C-alpha cells in the first residue's frame, strides 16, 4: 500500500510539471478592436515558426468556448458554420518565418461583439493564444472620427505621427488612447495605454510612443508603404475620435548605368542598355542622343524596357535602345548617348540623376575619351517645364524608357537640367515641353506620348524635335540630317569602340577565321578516312608454311627398347 502511494505521488508531480510547461508556453495580451456597424473586420494573429505546427483554431469566448474554425496541416480546414471555410478564415506563411491565421467578420453588428481567441498548437513549444476584444462603436458622430492625413518619408528615416494634427486636444488621464494599423481591410492594435502590445514581426522593436501619444516608427522600411495608422481616443462611452495617417515611402535610386553590348554587325547596329536599381515607388528612364550625320544617312531606332521587383521590395528598371544605320558612314561622324532617371521624392520634389556619356566617332580609328561627370553639376542646360504635373499622391506606373533626339536639321534644342539634387517641381508624369527654332520640324522623328498605346501623330511635319515615345512601342524613323548641332557638354568618361581601317567589323573577321579552321579540319578528316580505306582494301601479306619438325632419339642400353630408326618411323 505504501509503494502504491509513492507511485501516485511521483506521477502527480510529473503531471504538474507537464501542465506547468504548457501554461508557460501559453501567452496572449488582449487587444481591443473598434469597428462601425455594418463594416468588415479582419482579425489576424501571428506566431514564429518554432517547432512543428500541430493545428490552429479560432474560437469565440462566451460562457464557454465556441469553436469557429480549425486548420490542420494534413487534414485541412474545418468550420462549425454553414458558410465555406475559405470565406471565414485564411492561413498564410508570409515572409519573416511566421505563421499567419486570419478570421474574416463581415457586416458586423452588436451580436458580433465579444472576445475572439486565436490559438496555435506547436510541438514541442505548446499552446500559444491571442485574444481580441471586438467592440462596435455606436452613436459616433461622422465629423469626429473622419480625419485623414498623408505623410511622405524617405526609407530608413524616422516616422513621427501625432495623434491629432491641427487639433487643440488637451491630453488628459481620463482619455483612453490606442494606436491601430490597417492594411487591405485588416486592422491590428499596435499600442494601448501607451505601451506596445502587438506581436507582429513587421513592427517588432520599431514602434515607440512619445509623451504626448505620438507614434514613432524607426527605421522606415519599404513594406511600410500604404499602411494606415489610426489614433483612437475614447472621450466618453460612445464618443470616439479617430485620426488616420497614410504613409508614403520613397527610396532614392542609384545613378543609372549605361553600357553598350559588344555585338555590332555589318549593318552598323548598336545596342545600349540603361539600368536603374533601388527604385521605389516609380521612376522614368529617358534616352538622350546627340549626333551629327552627313546628308543622306538613314537610321532606325527603337527601345524596349522591362522591370522586376527584387527580394527587398525595390524595383529594378532596364531599358534597351537599338540603333541601326542603313549606310556605312563615309566620313567621321560622332554619336553621344546617355540616359537620365527621374524619380519622385518626398515633398512634391524630383530626384534627377544622369548616367555617364558614351561617345562614338564612326569611321575614326582613335576617338577621344571624355573626362568623368560631376554628379552634382548641371549638364544639360535649362530645366524643362512641368506645369501640368500633379502631386505624388497618385503616381502613374513608370513609363520606364523614353527617347529624346537631340539632333535636328537647324533647330536649337533646350535640354533639361540633370542634377542629382532635389528640384522643386511636381513629380507626376515627367513629361517635358521641348522648344525649337529655325526651320520646320518635318525632319524630326515621329513620336508617341509616354505611357499610352496611341499611334503617332499624322504626318512627319506635325512633330517636334525632342519628342518622347513609349519605350515598349517600336518606332522606326528615317531621319536625314544636314547640319551639326553645337551643344555644350560636360566631358564624361565613356566606352569608345573603334572600327578597323578597312571598315570590316571584328565579328566578320572572327567568323572568317572560324570558317577557315573548320574547312581545314574537314579536309584533314577526309584525308585520314581515305588512308584508312586504302589500308583495309590491300590483300593480306604472304606467310610461308613452317618447316618440318625432325625428332631425335637417344638410345639407352637398358631394356629391350625399339631401335632409333624404328622410333623415327613412328
Swiss-Prot record:
Biased composition (Polar residues): 450-461, 469-486
Tree of life domain: Eukaryota
Region annotation (Disordered) ranges: 373-403, 441-486
Position of the signal peptide: 1-21
Cross-referenced InterPro entries: CD96, Ig-like_dom, Ig-like_dom_sf, Ig-like_fold, Ig_sub
Source organism of the structure: Bos taurus (Bovine)
Membrane topology reported for the UniProt record: Single-pass type I membrane protein
Ranges in the topological domain labelled Extracellular: 22-504
Keywords annotated in UniProt: Cell adhesion, Disulfide bond, Glycoprotein, Immunoglobulin domain, Membrane, Repeat, Signal, Transmembrane, Transmembrane helix
Residue intervals of the Ig-like C2-type domain: 253-359
Gene3D superfamilies: Immunoglobulins (2.60.40.10)
rRNA processing among keywords: no
GO CC annotations on file: membrane
Gene Ontology process terms (BP): cell-matrix adhesion; inflammatory response
Domain Ig-like V-type: 38-125, 156-222
Function, as annotated: May be involved in adhesive interactions of activated T and NK cells during the late phase of the immune response. Promotes NK cell-target adhesion by interacting with PVR present on target cells. May function at a time after T and NK cells have penetrated the endothelium using integrins and selectins, when they are actively engaging diseased cells and moving within areas of inflammation.
Chain ranges on the Cytoplasmic side, renumbered to this chain: 526-570
Subunit structure and binding partners: Homodimer; disulfide-linked. Interacts with PVR.
Major subcellular location class: membrane
PROSITE patterns: IG_LIKE
Regions crossing the membrane: 505-525
SMART domains the UniProt entry points to: IG (SM00409)
Protein name: T-cell surface protein tactile
Carbohydrate-modified residues: 42, 107, 148, 156, 166, 184, 261, 284, 334, 352, 374, 431, 484
